[in-house]
Curated annotation (Swiss-Prot):
Keyword entries, A-Z: ATP-binding, Cytoplasm, Kinase, Nucleotide-binding, Transferase
Enzyme Commission no: 2.7.4.3
Binding site for ATP: 10-18
Protein name, entry field: Adenylate kinase
GO molecular function: adenylate kinase activity; ATP binding
Gene encoding the protein: adkA
Keyword Kinase found: yes
Gene Ontology annotations for the cellular component aspect, listed alphabetically: cytoplasm
Amino acid sequence: MKNKVVVVTGVPGVGGTTLTQKTIEKLKEEGIEYKMVNFGTVMFEVAKEEGLVEDRDQMRKLDPDTQKRIQKLAGRKIAEMAKESNVIVDTHSTVKTPKGYLAGLPIWVLEELNPDIIVIVETSSDEILMRRLGDATRNRDIELTSDIDEHQFMNRCAAMAYGVLTGATVKIIKNRDGLLDKAVEELISVLK
């Protein structure tokens, strides 16, 4: 039986990584194993090895051609991991760059990963802005709530395009403040 490849996406600050980690812990208690792979971390490792960046948040400022090359290499590495176990790929559906939105999972990455499910984690732009302002561990750009809304809209558009190209289903999960457990239960039902 083929291992599942599930992509979990969301704008920075939406809580997708936290949601995914808590979901994997709960699934493990039920005997269901998933390996979490962060696409950005794999990309960062490749870029850092090449001396292109020093911290993760510099990734989105790389020129598009460099980002595309690094995406392809990261996709190949993750595809190899998916041969061994169920994988959740924690990533961004789109990356906001100075030159416009870049697809987080372009065709050359999708062809490698061939995901079964794409999950978009969302919440209100006000909640995202407050989370970003409260996170001193990251060097994030400050955006207006209207910019965050636009980014979430672009993520939905991109995720549906990914679904069209791969046959993956697309699920939207709301991760509202104080309701993480509800979002975890919803993601568990998608992954079982």
